[in-house]
């Protein structure tokens, strides 16, 4: 599965994986290629369903330790070298967040900046819908409008809308530092 393969290149530390017997050879290859030293458990489909509580049609699930989420001035350090970020507010559907993360990565967005009301970007559903792309983008949170204004100092902000009267973003010149909302 693509999301699991992307986990290996994301910088998140893999703790263990549970796979169907027939998936083990591919996971063993990934473990070796990325020097992962974590348990790899195998089982049959019935056991996996009993352990996870649902039918994983791909037959692979992994647990990983998250990279620390930047806070305070660390956020500015992460943003310093970037040119395009996405700012998300009040997004509480994991499928929507996953779809946005996947699309954002395709369009060169380098980080996700989320308010405190946004769902955890690392929920199983968000990771799966994003096809693992959410694992690659630095993610940080802001706590208030003032906090966001401080983070976006020096950034040009574009509010996106599908409304027919909006400017066509493909016709606009991109500023050197762009925050998409």
Identify the meaning behind each predicted range.
Residues 1-55, 59, 154:
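N-terminal positively charged helical leader segments and presequences
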Residues 5, 9, 41-42, 68-169:
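RNA substrate-binding interface of SAM-dependent RNA methyltransferases
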Residues 13-17, 36-39, 110-112, 137, ...:
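Short active-site oxyanion
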Residues 17-20, 156-162, 179-181:
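Short, hydrophobic beta-strand segments that form beta-sheet elements in well-ordered domains
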Residues 55-57, 132-133, 174:
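Short Pro/Gly-enriched coil loops immediately N-terminal to beta-strands
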Residues 59, 83, 177:
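Conserved catalytic motifs of the protein kinase core domain
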Residues 62:
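Glycine-rich phosphate-binding loops that contact phosphosugars or nucleotide phosphates
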Residues 171-180:
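A contiguous loop/helix-start segment that scaffolds small-molecule binding in enzyme catalytic cores
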């Amino acid at each position: 599965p693509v999301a699991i393969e992307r986990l290996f290149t994301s910088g998140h530390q893999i703790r263990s994986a549970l796979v169907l017997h027939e998936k083990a050879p591919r996971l063993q290859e990934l473990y070796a290629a990325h020097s992962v030293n974590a348990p790899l458990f195998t089982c049959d489909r019935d056991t996996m369903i009993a352990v996870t509580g649902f039918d994983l049609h791909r037959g692979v699930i992994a647990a990983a330790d998250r990279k620390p989420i930047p806070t305070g001035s660390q956020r500015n350090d992460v943003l310093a070298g970037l040119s395009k970020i996405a700012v998300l507010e009040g997004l509480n559907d994991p499928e929507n967040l996953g779809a946005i993360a996947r699309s954002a990565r395709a369009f060169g967005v380098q980080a996700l900046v989320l308010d405190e009301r946004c769902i955890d970007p690392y929920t199983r559903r968000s990771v799966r819908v994003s096809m693992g792309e959410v694992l690659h983008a630095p993610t940080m949170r802001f706590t208030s409008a003032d906090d966001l204004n401080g983070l976006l100092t020096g950034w040009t902000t574009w509010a996106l809308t599908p409304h027919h009267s909006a400017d066509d973003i493909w016709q606009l010149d991109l500023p050197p530092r762009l925050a998409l909302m």
